[in-house]
Amino acid sequence: MEREDLESLANRGEYQALIEALADPQPFIRLHAVGILASLGEKVVPLLVDALDHHNPEVRKGAAKALGEIGSKEALMPLIIKLDKDIPSVAQFILEALAKIGDSSVVPILCRCTRHHSLPVRYSAVRCLGNLGDRRAIPFLIDNLSDTANIVRLRAVESLAKMEEPSLWSPISELLTDESAGVRAAAAKALGNMGNPRAVDALIGLLGSDVETDLLEAARALGKLKSRRALAFLKAAREREGREKVLKALDEAIYQIESDVQT
């Protein structure tokens, strides 16, 4: 099947055939079929809801994705019902759809899924809650900072940083000593973006690392925070550093702070 075939099906009103195309072996065809179905809007919602019961998981994934793109509130309850009944790989798509529809009633459901036994489900729930920005999610996301999976901890940091809650600098700063370099970098970046000066000391501690991403993100964050207290530590890190990329980040941070002091 080609893209043109999908468009012909849509033009002829053969919407069920379009739904069956969600099972195509080619990922780009499946994705294009989702896009066409989503563009058709409310008139295909009943067919897409029925497709949530399809025997092929790829069809169920595509149907959920299309429903999320359409944003129909009518799809909320069918999606919620299917969430706990389907396999984790499909449940991910259902969570994404619920979040895109954006009704506040789904927040407790997403919060519950942050404690799911399946890693993909936890990851998707944490990411979706960050996109929604509902403060009810904060205690659940804090719990996910101690998740066994690096990628869930990383996403929890990013989601919490979107909540615009100044006090969250404290639990996020604890991740600066995480075993994962990616998580440490995400925590440093989040602290810089949050702008809370109370995070300065924790970020200074990260300058003692030899890991490139630690130094890069710590320098960038400290530059954003413009703390004079960090200057001596940034300069000391520069003296012992030889990597060009890190030197540039340290120089930029020093310049940001010194320029701010002069103004």
Residues covered by each model-derived region:
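Short inter-helical turns and helix N-cap capping residues of alpha-solenoid HEAT/ARM repeat scaffolds
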Residues: 25-26, 55-56, 86-87, 117-118, ...
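Amphipathic alpha-helical scaffolding segments comprising HEAT/armadillo-like alpha-solenoid repeats
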Residues: 10-22, 42-53, 72-84, 103-115, ...
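TPR/Sel1-like alpha-solenoid repeat signature
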Residues: 37, 51, 63, 67, ...
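Core register positions within helices of long alpha-helical scaffolds
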Residues: 5-8, 36-39, 66-69, 97, ...
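Conserved hydrophobic register position within alpha-solenoid helical repeats
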Residues: 2-5, 33, 63, 94, ...
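Alpha-helical segment of the N-proximal tetratricopeptide repeat
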Residues: 2-9, 17-39
